[in-house]
Curated annotation (Swiss-Prot):
The keyword Cytoplasm applies. The gene is glnS. One of its GO terms (molecular function) is ATP binding. PANTHER family: GLUTAMATE--TRNA LIGASE, GLUTAMINE-TRNA LIGASE. It is an enzyme of class 6 (ligase). The lineage of its organism: Bacteria, Pseudomonadati, Pseudomonadota, Gammaproteobacteria, Lysobacterales. Belongs to the class-I aminoacyl-tRNA synthetase family. One of its GO terms (biological process) is glutamyl-tRNA aminoacylation. A motif ('HIGH' region) lies at residues 41-51. Keywords: Aminoacyl-tRNA synthetase, ATP-binding, Cytoplasm, Ligase, Nucleotide-binding, Protein biosynthesis. It comes from the Bacteria. This is Glutamine--tRNA ligase. InterPro entries: aa-tRNA-synth_I_CS (IPR001412), Gln-tRNA-synth (IPR004514), Gln/Glu-tRNA_Ligase (IPR050132), Gln_tRNA_ligase_bac (IPR022861), Glu/Gln-tRNA-synth (IPR000924), Glu/Gln-tRNA-synth_Ib_cat-dom (IPR020058), Glu/Gln-tRNA-synth_Ib_codon-bd (IPR020059), Glu_tRNA_lig_a-bdl (IPR020061). It catalyses: tRNA(Gln) + L-glutamine + ATP = L-glutaminyl-tRNA(Gln) + AMP + diphosphate.
Amino acid sequence: MSETLATDATAPAEKKDFIRQIVREDLASGKHTVIRTRFPPEPNGYLHIGHAKAICLDFGLAAEFGGLCNLRLDDTNPAKEDPEFVVAIQDDVRWLGYDWAQLRHASDYFQVYYLAAQKLIRDGHAFVCDLSAEQVRQYRGTLTEPGRNSPFRERSVEENLDLFARMRAGEFPDGARTLRAKIDMASGNINLRDPALYRIKHVEHQNTGNAWPIYPMYDFAHSLGDAVEGITHSLCTLEFEDHRPLYDWCVDKVDLVGHPELLQPLLDKGLPREAAKPRQIEFSRLNINYTVMSKRKLTALVEEQLVDGWDDPRMYTLQGLRRRGYTPAAMRLFVDRVGISKQNSLIDFSVLEGCLREDLDAAAPRRMAVIDPLKLVLTNLPEGHTETLQFSNHPKDDSFGTREVPFARELWIEREDFAEVPPKGWKRLVPGGEIRLRGAGIARVDEVIKNADGEIVELRGWLDPESRPGMEGANRKVKGTIHWVSAAHAVEAEIRLYDRLFSVEKPDDESEGKTYRDYLNPESKRNVRGYVEPSAAMAAPEQAFQFERTGYFVADRRDHSEATPVFNRSVTLRDTWAK
C-alpha cells in the first residue's frame, strides 16, 4: 500500500485530551514535522471492542494532524498466531473506516532485531543465560525484595556472542537458554530486573518458515519496531506504563538512529530508512460493564460452544459487533464519547447502545415487520382485495424517498398489540375498540376466533372506509397506532432477537465463587419466525432498518438472502436495561 497521508472526514475539528495536547506541543516546537503512529496487534485472535479505542486513537490522531499510521502485525509468537487472524484484523481496521500508510510485520525486522541484540552484547548490555524459567523466577525477587544476579551474568562478550550465534543456528532445545538484558536486579521496577530479550522456540513462522529458531520478546521487538518505523508517538494502554523504562532502555541502548548499519537488512529489502526515537504514551483501556474482554475468556466461550463462533452477534469482537449491526460511525462516536484519559473507569454498556441508536435513527430506513404474528381479517373489504400504499422511508429525512407497501384484506399484526382483557392504560386493540393501522386507516375488532385450546388464532374486524389516508375521517382521534404487514405479500423471515450476553454488570467478578460462565444470560438469543414487508426481504446483507415500533435490525451478513431473509436485532428502540 502506498504511503499517503491519513485522512478522516468524520474526525471532529478539535479534541482536547492530553495526548492531542502533547502532539500539538511537539508540532509547535518543531520537535516533529510529521506525526507517525501505529496500531500493532498480535495476530493471535480476533480484535474486540477494546481494540476499537486504540484503532480510532492511532489512526484518528494521525488523520487529524495530517500524519501517517502504520498497521504492524506483532508476529513474534508464532505458536499462537494464524493467517486467519491477520485477514480479520485488516478487515476490522478497514471496516472502522481507516487505512494504513504501510502494512508491516514485526517479522520484517527479525534480522534488525538480531543485529541489535549483537550490539547490546558487544556493548556489555546483554548476556546469554542458562537459568530455567523456574530458576529465573526464583532469582527475580519480589516487589519488596531485590533480585539476585544470574550466575551467567558475567560471561565474556566473546562467549555471549558465540552462544547467541549458536542459539540462532538452532543448536539448543527450547528453553535451554535466553538472551537477557543486563540492567539492574535490584530495581524497584521488576521489568528492569534483567528481562529476557530472546528465547529459543523451534516453531514454524507463518512468514519466515523455519528460518528462525529464536524469537524476540515483546518489549524488545515492540520498542525497536517503533524506532525502525520512525513512530513519533507510541500509544498504549496503562498496563504498559511500568514497561516504559524498559522501552526507553531498548531504544536508547540500541540507538538505531546513531547506528544506521543495523538497518541495512531493511534497505536490502527495499524498505525506507525511517528510524527515529519514539515516545511511549499511556492511556486508560476501555472497560465496559456486562462484558468480558480477556482473549482467554473469549476463546473459551467459542471453544466451549457457549456462543456460535467469533462473529456471534453477542460477542464483543469487532466481527461480532459488525454482524450484530453496529456501524463504524456508531463505534467511532462511542470512542469519542468515552474520551481519552489516564483514569481507568467502567463504561456503561448503554452508552454503546445509545451511540448505535443515535446513528441508526438518522441513517436507517424504516420498514414494517411483525415478529409474533396474529392474523387480522378486515371483513368489509372484498375477498382478494389488495392495493398499494406509499410510505416514507424516513420520517425525518425526505432524501430517503418513498416506497410502495402492499395492503390487503388479511394482515399480520403483533400478537402483543391485542388484549382481550386490557390492562389499565391500554392504548392498542381490544374487542370492539378502534386502532389506527399505520398509513392505512382506522380499524375495529368485532370478533375474536380461538382454537380448541382457547388460544386466539385470528381477529376479524372492519376498516373505516372514511378514514383512509388523505380523507377527512383520517383525522379522527384514536388511542394508538400499530404496524402491520399484508399476509398475502409479506415474506416469512428468521428474526434473531439478541440481547446482552451476560446478565450482571461485572461477569468477571468471582468473589462469590462463580465465574463468568455462571452469568451467561439465557435470554441473550431467541430465534423467531416473523413476517417482513417485501422491500425488507430484498435488502442486501448488512443493510440496517428500523422495524417500526420494534427496534433496529440488520440483514445478517452471513445468512441473509432475498429467498431466506434473516434479520438480527441490533438494539431495542429504548434502553430495556435501565434501572
